[in-house]
């Protein structure tokens, strides 16, 4: 477990570093946009603009190298294509997560309802069979025992 803890700490550190790099790149592009808007056209301003552009290209290059490093813990992180599509569409990936969790919850509730309904049907049918055919009580109880969950999942809420 200690190896997993170390790997998790390394992954968290790499994620934090990558997040800082992305934030820095975004901030640089915002600054670049402001600089372009207010660009006076002087040779000094042109030189500063080129320096700023080169800094942005270098930051993007470092981020690209980091993200494609096979030794990095980040190479083992899979991001669902749907999340990437959400981001490309300008949507918040947290919305994807919330909608996904809600869909799973609805599906679980539906499945739980089906299981509960089938259990009631099984028990009702078993009662009717035993009432009409008392000699089948033992096989019916065996069937109920074999078709009942080991841990009482249906009673958990």
Swiss-Prot record:
InterPro entries recorded: Mediator_Med10
Any Pfam family hit: Med10
Keywords: Activator, Nucleus, Transcription, Transcription regulation
Main localisation: nucleus
Domain of life: Eukaryota
Further comment: Present with 1472 molecules/cell in log phase SD medium.
Protein family: Belongs to the Mediator complex subunit 10 family.
Subunit structure: Component of the Mediator complex, which is composed of at least 21 subunits that form three structurally distinct submodules. The Mediator head module contains MED6, MED8, MED11, SRB4/MED17, SRB5/MED18, ROX3/MED19, SRB2/MED20 and SRB6/MED22, the middle module contains MED1, MED4, NUT1/MED5, MED7, CSE2/MED9, NUT2/MED10, SRB7/MED21 and SOH1/MED31, and the tail module contains MED2, PGD1/MED3, RGR1/MED14, GAL11/MED15 and SIN4/MED16. The head and the middle modules interact directly with RNA polymerase II, whereas the elongated tail module interacts with gene-specific regulatory proteins.
Protein known as: Mediator of RNA polymerase II transcription subunit 10
Biological source species: Saccharomyces cerevisiae (strain ATCC 204508 / S288c) (Baker's yeast)
């Amino acid at each position: 477990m200690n190896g997993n803890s170390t790997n998790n700490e390394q992954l968290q550190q790499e994620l934090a570093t990558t997040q800082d790099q992305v934030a820095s790149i975004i901030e640089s592009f915002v600054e670049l946009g402001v600089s372009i808007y207010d660009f006076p056209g002087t040779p000094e301003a042109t030189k500063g603009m080129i320096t700023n552009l080169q800094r942005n290209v270098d930051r993007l290059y470092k981020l690209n190298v980091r993200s494609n490093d096979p030794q990095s813990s980040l190479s083992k992180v899979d991001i669902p294509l749907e999340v990437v599509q959400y981001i490309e569409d300008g949507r918040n990936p947290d919305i994807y997560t919330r909608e996904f969790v809600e869909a799973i919850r609805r599906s679980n509730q539906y499945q739980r309802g089906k299981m509960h309904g089938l259990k009631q049907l099984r028990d009702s049918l078993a009662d009717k069979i035993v009432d009409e055919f008392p000699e089948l009580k033992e096989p019916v109880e065996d069937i109920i025992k074999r078709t009942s969950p080991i841990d009482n999942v249906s009673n958990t809420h």
